């Protein structure tokens, strides 16, 4: 398992498939630009932690899982296993889990990997976070590339077991475009969960 986490009481994690824009989103949230980003999947292979010691708080960008060009399957599985173990180990300290997905591709990817013997990664991770009792926000990224926005978000809600229309789940589904700096729906959703856990003092980060 990853052993790089600073010893902080509270944490927010970003998780998702490779190449969905997690590191770009991390940069947008923190204003810090030292996070690796790249056009080929799998650039981030270990967690990036952004640490606010004075607030006893850390935001963690976990490595992407799923397809990574040129990366053997056993390595991909190992990374996914480490991500799962990290979340399990720190579940009690995680104030919110942000599952980042590619708004343009996510429904097609879910449908392509749905079958009697297969659960799509995004659906599995959403269920996993919920099962652990971690407040979950799905950051539906790259929405600037989506034309049929409401229809696409309704379809995603349905795939995640949420009854459309998607708007009734605005504390769980946040349409954003990290590259364009348009992340206010995510900030509002995260603030909702921070408020529920009496951590309004962390609003300044979102």
UniProtKB/Swiss-Prot annotation:
The keyword Plastid does not apply. One of its GO terms (molecular function) is metal ion binding. It holds the Pfam family MMR_HSR1. GTP binds at residues 16-23, 42-46, 61-64, 141-144, 176-178. Keywords: Cell cycle, Cell division, GTP-binding, Magnesium, Metal-binding, Nucleotide-binding, Septation. Its cofactor is Mg(2+). NCBIfam families: PRK04213.1 (NF003255), small_GTP (TIGR00231). Belongs to the TRAFAC class TrmE-Era-EngA-EngB-Septin-like GTPase superfamily. EngB GTPase family. This is Probable GTP-binding protein EngB. It comes from Natronomonas pharaonis (strain ATCC 35678 / DSM 2160 / CIP 103997 / JCM 8858 / NBRC 14720 / NCIMB 2260 / Gabara) (Halobacterium pharaonis). The lineage of its organism: Archaea, Methanobacteriati, Methanobacteriota, Stenosarchaea group, Halobacteria.
């Amino acid at each position: 398992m990853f052993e790089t986490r600073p010893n902080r009481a509270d944490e927010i994690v970003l998780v998702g498939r490779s190449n969905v824009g997690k590191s770009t989103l991390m940069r947008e949230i923190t204003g810090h630009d030292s996070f690796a980003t790249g056009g080929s999947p799998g650039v981030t292979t270990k967690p990036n932690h952004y640490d606010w010691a004075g607030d006893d708080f850390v935001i963690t960008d976990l490595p992407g899982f799923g397809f990574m060009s040129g990366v053997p399957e056993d390595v991909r599985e190992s990374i996914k296993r480490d991500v799962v173990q990290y979340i399990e180990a720190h579940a009690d300290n995680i104030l919110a889990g942000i599952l980042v997905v590619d708004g343009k591709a996510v429904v097609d990817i879910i449908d392509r990997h749905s079958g009697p013997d297969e659960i799509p990664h995004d659906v599995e991770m959403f269920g996993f976070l919920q099962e652990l009792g971690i407040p979950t926000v799905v950051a539906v990224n790259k929405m600037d590339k989506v034309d049929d926005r409401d229809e696409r978000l309704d379809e995603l809600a349905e795939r995640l077991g949420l009854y459309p229309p998607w708007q009734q789940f605005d504390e769980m589904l946040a349409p954003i475009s990290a590259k364009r700096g348009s992340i206010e729906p995510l900030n509002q959703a995260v603030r909702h969960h921070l408020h529920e856990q009496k951590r309004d003092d962390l609003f300044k980060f979102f």
